[in-house]
């Protein structure tokens, strides 16, 4: 007997996950297309209140082993849902996909953008941002709104990346690109951290504490505040990392912007004589700007 995708999806929204949720979880664009062509609402919530786009992007959390997240098929599934009108900001106030665990209450929860940031795929982050996903919102913990802890796409994405690498200097290229895209989209680099053990550390301070050297200049260029050392909050590891030679150079220079400006001037002095006979003089600063990570080292 043939199964009606629309009827199956409507039943699943009440009784539990079947084809629609599985198609979203696995990023199966063709299966999703069949449901949508049959008239299923693109923002139909599952029993836990998640929309297909949230599920496809991993807003429920890091995908378990066995799920292939970084695939062209998943990108196609996300693009399909957005093309059919899925809310890129599902999970936020006045949007579908809010937490419905508590009777009579709708609470903000992880958005598709947060899910893509956690799972570390820059392509899906870019697709969502182009579709209107907001990088700025910070939401309270839906399971404990009084805790005072908040979440943002930049925060959860960097936290996930730095924890995967144990603070290694070489954060993977996807996570670096994600952070850069979110900062350019207006994400707050000084937002509170998501980890309770971190106390009142901002994201900038948390990145220093865990030792994420590669993302420090990215956050600083985006307006990250470099707190004085020692921080006087009992985080001995933070104080150790805060004394890193790179950060000490910024202190001596008077801050990142001053250091960046001096770095630019040094490189211009070196390269201007070499390029002025090849290109107009006014283009040399642009070449330096796009060829080097000014202030990053």
Segments (PLM) and residue ranges:
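Ankyrin repeat A-helix N-terminal signature
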Residues: 22-27, 55-74, 103-107, 115-121, ...
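Ankyrin repeat domain, specifically the short helix-to-loop turn at the C-terminus of the second helix
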Residues: 33-41, 79-88, 126-134, 180-188, ...
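N-terminal segments that cap or nucleate solenoid repeat domains
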Residues: 2-55
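Acidic/polar low-complexity surface segments
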Residues: 59, 92-104, 141-145
């Amino acid at each position: 007997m043939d199964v009606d995708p629309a009827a199956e999806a409507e039943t699943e929204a009440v009784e539990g996950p079947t084809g629609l949720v599985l198609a979203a979880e696995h990023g199966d664009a063709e299966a999703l297309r069949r449901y949508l062509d049959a008239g299923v609402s693109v923002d139909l919530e599952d029993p836990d209140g998640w929309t297909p786009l949230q599920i496809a992007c991993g807003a429920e959390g890091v995908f378990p082993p066995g799920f292939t997240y970084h695939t062209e098929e998943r990108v196609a599934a996300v693009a399909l849902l957005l093309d059919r009108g899925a809310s890129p900001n599902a999970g936020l106030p006045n949007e579908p996909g809010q937490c419905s665990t508590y009777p009579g209450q709708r609470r903000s929860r992880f958005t598709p953008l947060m899910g893509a940031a956690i799972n570390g795929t820059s392509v899906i982050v870019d697709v969502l941002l182009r579709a209107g996903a907001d990088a700025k919102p910070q939401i309270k913990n839906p399971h404990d709104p009084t805790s005072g802890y908040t979440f943002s796409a930049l925060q959860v994405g960097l936290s996930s990346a730095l924890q995967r690498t144990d603070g290694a200097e070489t954060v993977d290229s996807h996570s670096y690109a994600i952070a850069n895209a979110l900062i350019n989209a207006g994400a707050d680099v000084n937002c509170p951290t998501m980890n309770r053990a971190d106390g009142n550390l901002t994201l900038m301070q948390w990145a220093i504490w865990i030792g994420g050297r590669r993302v420090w200049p990215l956050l600083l260029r985006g307006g990250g505040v470099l707190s004085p050392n020692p921080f006087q909050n009992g985080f001995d590891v933070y104080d150790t990392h805060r004394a890193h030679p790179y950060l000490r150079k910024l202190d001596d220079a008077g801050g990142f912007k001053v250091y960046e400006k001096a770095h630019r001037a040094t490189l211009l002095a070196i390269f201007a004589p070499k390029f002025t006979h090849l290109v107009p003089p006014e283009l040399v600063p642009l070449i330096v700007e796009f060829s080097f990570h000014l202030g990053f080292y």
